[in-house]
Amino acid sequence: MRKSVLLAIAGISLFATSLAAQIQGEYMETRSADVYTGQCFANGEVNLVGTEAILAWKVDRGSWDGVNLDGRTIAAALRANATLGDPYADPYPAKAVLMVDDQASPAQKKALVSLAKHYAGRLLENVVEVRSEPVMMETPQNHHQHGPARMMAGSMAAIQTRPLNDTDHLCGNEVTFYPPLVKLDHSVPAVALTDRYDGPGLGTEWTLHGKRSAFLGRFSEGNSTQQSAVSTQSAGGGD
């Protein structure tokens, strides 16, 4: 009897764990404005830069919309209507180009697009092009470190980061001025040694070096969140 109870408890525990993290993975982000900065530098960039961004997700393990996505990656390059994160301006409408793992099956590609849209919301409301590319993403094993990390999406986009250090304190009162553009479990700012987009669809290309404009982070979702997203889409309220 006691053994049966213990087995039942163990089963419930495993079930609860699977609900708590049905899908999880790594996230990278770069912006064309510094995200780790002081008020004076941020004021100098607002309305001038910060309308461009690259977002990337790599699934460590798990499923989305009932499709296993272990090891699959998707990246998005976008151009907004105003400095992203500025509370006094409207960045919408934004235009986006998606770069989907070329090793993914058609079902996986569809699920990756759904996952990215779930996280980025209105930023990916207007996708002008979806490309199949060899997307590679490497992040630190210790997720609380500030890099290094890198992401490449064929010849279209690239990110390379390094940790923040004392030389990155220019005015002495730097903070994480802008939060990440998506919901994350954990994130840290980093320096983007390279932030490049050479693809079509956005009406602009960029190559930036040495800006304090990157985030590394982790994401996860449970079954209840996925079920809610699917229900919303079925009702016509999702992307």
Identify the residue ranges that each predicted region occupies.
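Bacterial N-terminal signal peptides that target proteins for export
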Residues: 1-9
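N-terminal Sec/ER secretory leader and immediately downstream segment
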Residues: 22-100
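Mature, soluble, non-transmembrane domains
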Residues: 99-219
